[in-house]
Amino acid sequence: MVPTSALPRSPGHPFYAALNKLLAEAKFDAYVEGLCEPLYREGGRPSIPPGVYFRMLFIGYFEGIDSQRGIAWRCSDSLSLRSFLGLKPTESTPDHSSLTIIRQRLPKELIEQVFSFVLTMAFEKKLLKGKSIGVDATTLEANAAMKSIVRREGGGTWKAYLTQLAKEAGIEDPTDDQLRQFDRKRKGKKTSNDDWQSPSDPDARITKMKDGTTGFAYKAEHAVDLDTEIVVAADVKPADQADGETVKDTVVDAQGNLNDATKQECRITEVVADKGYHKTETLVWLGDRGIRTYVAPRRDTRKRRWDDKPEGWQEAHRENQRRTGRDKGKQLQRKRAERVERSFAHVCTTGGARRTWVRGIVEVSKRYLVTVMAHNLGVILRTLIGVGKPREWASMRGFLATCAALWLAILADLVAAGHRVAELASDFADQLLRPRWHFSTSPEAASSTAC
């Protein structure tokens, strides 16, 4: 038997200690436990506290781990992360399967309430303005393979489809190599979402990925406060939906989150987006709600006709074009390109959300929303302590150590130079005080100099 006092302990990571302090001041654990209480049974085996569940998913963002299995491994290996989770030395960390069960049981509406609570934390720290909103989208790689696609009608596989086409082209009983060669050379091939789907994740859509390949994906859309870089709304949508249509739901969600977080003190007055969102119907829809649009216009050499369009469409189009061409519009577009893209870089590239390991648009949305939640906490911490991720803390320590080493080297050089200057000054003073000519008063010297 090993006494508890003999078990290894950790003083904790300074970044996670600051995050725990921030959550404790906002009473985060009490809030999420109150929300989840109706979903827990009174009897039975003690369950995992909701605060521990959310903290483990936060760790996935801060450590750049995309899978729940990897998160569980990382937490079990680190004493500082165990301290962040509030686990005793004798307690084991939750298994990855427990994270899956909890995620499936928690409804998406509850995750959205917790997201609004984090926005309230940002508002209390003066980090939520909600006036100018930048909107953009990116693709998320789905947990589905193109080689397993099936027909929506009938469920036929891609291989069976190719075999039928090969037989129609005169190739009887084609081999796998012949099918691949036939598929590579045939013209007019098209893989449409109307005809094909993934049997493992029917919600995923066939689309072009960031690297130029074709695969199953989802679309993640952010609405970012351009003044503070807080993400006020984030949702996952089918990858084949047009940006001009999904922006309406995103703006509605953003305003609803702001109302919940600020008690209706913040109102969206400006929406900034790239040319992918330029749709006259959407411009009119936003204008009717008192929102000024700064949407980059598409480059269209054709002369547009407005006689067959509803009243007000031409005016909305031209007003948006004039606003975007002014200095303020150009400044907002630069800010959108910088800050909205930065949110995707933090959440997807370094935060582990680019590749999804769960299936179904609802499950992907819940997992992604918690990751964005962690990103907002990182923005708050970056304002309070100067860093928003543990790796930034390590980089800052390295930078400060380098600065300290340089300062000590410079100081040593100055001290050495000071000693050298003192020696030179002393020698110079000696030269000044030493007489240039020596006159002797001895009789011998006097007689020798007499005329």
Please give the residue ranges for each predicted region:
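Secretory-pathway/luminal and periplasmic proteins that interact with or process carbohydrate-rich
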Residues: S80-G86
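Short amphipathic alpha-helical interaction patches enriched in hydrophobic/aromatic residues
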Residues: Y40, G60-Y61, S83, R103-L106
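Generic start-of-chain signal for non-secretory N-termini
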Residues: M1-R9
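A short, ordered amphipathic alpha-helix with a cationic face
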Residues: S5, G44-S47, L87-P89, F344
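Anion-binding and metal-coordination hotspots
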Residues: D66-S76, L87-C451
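Basic, short loop/linker segments at the boundary and entry of helix-turn-helix/winged-helix-like folds
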Residues: R9-F58, E63
